[in-house]
Swiss-Prot record:
Protein name: Leucine aminopeptidase 2
Entry's cofactor comment: Binds 1 zinc ion per subunit.
Keywords: Cytoplasm, Hydrolase, Metal-binding, Metalloprotease, Nucleus, Protease, Zinc
InterPro entries: Aminopeptidase_N-like_N, Aminopeptidase_N-like_N_sf, ARM-type_fold, LTA4H, LTA4H_cat, M1_LTA-4_hydro/amino_C_sf, M1_LTA4H, Peptidase_M1
Subcellular location: Cytoplasm; Nucleus
Molecular function GO labels: aminopeptidase activity; epoxide hydrolase activity; metallopeptidase activity; zinc ion binding
């Protein structure tokens, strides 16, 4: 661990460079937040009240804001309108709201601020009713991670501080907030929610529109537009309670009472967002075969890793996401064991199969990481480091710019390596101990490492052999090959190799007859195996000088053979990879198909690399499609794609 001394912060948890607030000076005992929604003006106004303990006896409060109008400030119910200043904007962090605390103010005091959002709010997306599936009512949802809560309300906008919340909102439409419903006042169109578990600002959320609800388990509901409710119920109800029970056995009891999910409109920019009691999900998961429910397992795992135990800043994001991917794969492994036993396999064989499933999912993640690093271009040395440096040279860096699969997959692989070193049984004792130790807290990487070495004193020498500096502070892929079990992937690799070999001899008609027989092997593939098959085909690009655009005949024949399975699939993970393969070969029909597909979704996992590929093979088409669809995207997604296409 000597090699890490130079990186250890002076104090832990490390200070967050992505906030303008003086959050370390206070304990937030309670946050009371009210929203008033105006669909005509497309703004949210409201008031936030902080019950604060001034633990450092400072004479001011600094809060984060971004494109907010501040209309009133008071302390202990006394106006402070002459004692605050909204500083000029400092990109990318916004505008500091500086409030002087009167000398007579007690150590425990209340601060109340009235505010309204503006048209530049980056957290909110207002949708006209025509942009919804039901076409009956407008819709509003928000996405605050990483630093967008400050554009919704004045806040200590950092994961480094948490608070319980009391929420209320006034709107004529069905309204949901990140907590438990306490009361509905239908006469005044006002709802009241509470979140008793302390949460950081990025987990604050609001959604409203034409929303219906149905049960999918004893402690779980799913909510979405009425026209989609039956499909969502079918997709999730088989697995939901099983997911929770397996996670509880792995970690400890679920803290949040209910795990409810909201399937949002297509413009939602992520696969899921782990809002407590209001897990937000992309509609791309609704594919009719339950093959993408792993995203729900991921968001559920966040109930412990991220929501209960939180990274202290976005520099240490891997503590949220690496842990969550690890737990997600353990949950899916355990369910695979149960399924294998139900199919008559013995205990040993079932557990072996479960481990194969986990490692197969890890293979998919490894490929995603490789592809992500390739797409980073000149930024790979900066953004492929596990512990990010967001402090910047002149101004802090935007955490959104650093968002990638690195904290997810590089983080997972570090935890997987630790598990292999100490042994799975011993690591399983560490999991609940770690989450109990840091429950309700925010921590940095060094606190994790210190606790790890303290817990595994007997294995300290072995853990010290990990190349910690390479893992945490050097760019690129993980420094060791994890050598995952390829049993479930081998058939995918073999078929991809046959397709590649066929492409090399595609003018031979006899070869095509044989290829048609071989191609049908995908009929026996699971959805995940189809993903690995397509990933492997894409990966042949530029290997030993090979280029798919020189083998369009093969791509065209594959398009004929695989039309039903791939072009018409409802599985967005498969469809995106299929279009990506064909567009890599510069098949114009599929470049157009990719562009049209990007107009039906808002999930950045597909939108950003999709436009990046189109920009590479046909920039005119990429720009034309983006300009056609950009107003459909959430502000976060729109801003990132504009950067990717260098349109600003």
């Amino acid at each position: 661990m000597e090699e890490l001394k130079a990186y250890r912060p002076k104090t832990s948890p490390e200070l967050d460079p992505s906030t303008l607030s003086n959050y370390t000076c206070f304990t937030v005992k309670l946050t009371t937040l009210h929203f008033d929604i105006d669909f005509e003006k497309k703004i949210v106004s409201g008031k936030v009240k902080y019950d604060l303990l001034n633990k450092s006896e400072t004479d001011h409060v600094d809060l984060d804001t971004s494109y907010l109008d501040i209309t009133k400030v008071s302390i202990q119910n006394e106006s402070c309108d002459n004692q605050y200043k909204l500083h000029s904007r400092k990109e990318p962090l916004g505008s500091k709201l500086h409030i002087l605390i009167p000398a007579s103010t007690p150590k425990n005091f209340q601060l109340e601020i009235e505010f309204s959002t503006t048209s530049k709010c980056t957290a909110l997306q207002f949708l006209d009713k025509e942009a919804t599936d039901g076409k009956n009512h407008p819709y509003l949802f928000c996405q605050c991670q990483a630093i967008h809560a400050r554009s919704l309300f004045p806040s200590f906008d950092t994961p480094g501080i948490k608070s319980p919340y009391k929420f209320s909102a006034k709107s004529p439409l069905k309204t949901l907030l990140s907590g438990l419903l306490i009361k509905e006042d239908n006469e005044n169109n006002t709802v009241y929610f509470e979140q008793p578990v302390p949460i950081p600002s990025y987990l604050v959320s609001i959604a409203l529109g034409d929303i219906a609800r149905t049960s999918i388990g004893p402690r779980s509901d799913v909510m979405t537009e009425p026209v989609n409710l039956a499909k969502c119920k079918w997709e999730f109800e088989r697995d939901m309670e099983n997911f929770i029970q397996v996670a509880e056995k792995l970690i400890f009891e679920y803290e949040w009472q209910k795990f409810d999910s909201l399937v949002l409109p297509a413009s939602f920019p992520y696969g899921g967002m782990e809002i407590p009691n209001l897990c937000q999900l992309t509609p791309t998961l609704i594919c009719g075969d339950r093959s993408l429910v792993n995203v729900v397992a991921h968001e559920l795992a966040h109930s412990w890793s991220g929501n209960l135990v939180t990274n202290c800043s976005w520099e240490h994001f891997w503590l949220n996401e690496g842990w969550t991917v690890y737990l997600e794969r353990r949950i899916l492994e355990a369910l695979a064991v149960i399924e294998a036993k139900q199919q008559g396999k013995g205990d040993k064989e079932a557990h072996y199969y479960g481990e194969q499933v986990r490692q197969f999912n890890a293979i998919i993640g490894w490929t995603d990481l490789e592809n992500d690093l390739k797409s980073m271009g000149d930024n790979v040395d900066k953004y492929s480091i596990l512990v990010q440096d967001l402090k910047g040279k002149k101004n802090p860096d935007d955490p959104d710019d650093a968002f990638s699969t690195v904290p997810y997959e590089k983080g997972f692989n570090l935890l997987y390596l630790i598990e292999k070193i100490v042994g799975k049984e011993k690591f399983d004792l560490f999991i609940p101990a770690y989450f109990r130790e840091f429950r309700f807290k925010s921590l940095d990487t060094f606190q994790f490492i210190d606790y790890l070495f303290d817990f595994f004193k007997e294995d300290a020498v072995k853990l010290d052999q990990i190349e910690w500096k390479k893992w945490l502070y050097e760019p690129g892929m993980p420094p060791i090959d994890p050598k995952f079990d390829t049993t479930l992937a081998q058939a995918c690799y073999d078929l991809a190799k046959k397709c590649y070999q066929y492409a090399l001899s595609e003018d031979d008609e006899n070869e095509f007859t044989q290829f048609k027989l071989v191609a049908n092997e995908i009929n026996d593939f699971s959805p995940s195996q189809n993903i690995v098959f397509l990933d492997t085909l894409i990966a042949y690009e530029k290997v030993a000088g090979f280029s798919w655009k020189q083998h369009k005949k093969t791509l065209n024949r594959m398009a004929t053979l695989y039309h039903d399975q791939y072009t018409e699939t409802l599985n967005a993970e498969i469809k995106f990879r299929w279009f990506y393969l064909q567009a890599t070969g510069e098949v114009l029909d599929f470049e157009v198909a990719m562009g049209e597909f990007l107009g039906t979704i808002g999930r950045m996992k597909f939108v950003r690399p999709g436009y990046a590929l189109l920009n590479k093979v046909n920039r005119e088409l990429a720009v034309r499609y983006f300009q056609r669809f950009e107003n459909r995207y959430h502000p976060i997604c729109k801003a990132m794609v504009r950067k990717d296409l260098q349109l600003d």
